[in-house]
Every structure is written in structure tokens, then in C-alpha cells.
Amino acid sequence: MADRMTPEQRHRCMSRIRGRDTKPELVVRRWLWHQGFRYRLYVKSLPGRPDIVMRKWRTVIFVNGCFWHGHGCQKHRPATNAQFWQEKIVRNRERDARNQAQLQAAGWHVIVIWECQLMPKRRLDTLRELDLALSRIVLQHNGAPAPYPDIDDSPAIAAEPPMSPLDPCTG
């Protein structure tokens, strides 16, 4: 499909897209601040220039836009010039993976939050997951005797034997 804008119109439109202080970033930053976490923004000396840096906990947080970083959400797929955008997004994803690997190799904890995870329906769950992840990091840095095990889907062991279908207590 042909572009309906002149190059000047396209340039003006694209130049207005914000890369900093986006609404999803502000949601995360406000929540972190209210939880008592202090941070720096866009530290140039770190690979990928993370959105949020908590040096005390050696943790960086990237708040990624689903379109620009290729999350794959249905409503964030390009409608025009698809080939260009597909190549651009692949390059962005490769760059993101490279930056995250460099940060992890340097001993940083990397947390990625996607724009769609901060939509009103999922925001609370996402912030709870962030709270859990940061709690684990804080415990690890404070020398907790044993980290919490990762939650998995394996069957749990019950403290009591399973109830019989004929048991009068089960009604």
C-alpha cells in the first residue's frame, strides 16, 4: 500500500512519537516511587540505556512499547509498509537481546515490562509480578539464606490424603 503522506508530513508525524516519559513508563515509575524504590532514568553508561536503573539492587527495567520492540500483540502490527517495519522490528529485537545479554553478563538483573501488560485490565497483576521480582532481588542482595523457589506447574504434595467421593464431609 502506498504511503498517503508526503515525506515532510511523515517526518513531522514520526518526530512526535515519544521515546521517553511514556505513559507506561510513568505508571511503573510512580508505582516504584510509592513502594519506596529510588532510581535513575536513562543511564547512558549502560548498554541499551535502560528506562529505569536501580543501582542499589543492580536492576534495570525496560518498559517496551509493543510495536517498536516486536511483542507481537495483534493490535500493534503495522498495516502499511509491512516489509520495512518487519525488518526494523527484527533489528530492534536483536539489539534488545544483545543489550540484555551484556547487562546480565555484567551482573545486572534485567526486567522487561511490555506496554500491553500495563493496560488497565492487566496493570495490577503486572505490578504484583514486578513486586515479587524486586522482592526476590532485594532478598538475594541482603543475603537471604535461601531464595524462594520458582513457582512451577508441577503437582503439589497435599498434607492430607485426597477425600473419597463417598466421604460425608465433602457433601
Q: Model regions: which residues?
A:
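Nucleic-acid endo/exonuclease domains
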Residues: 1-112, 116-171
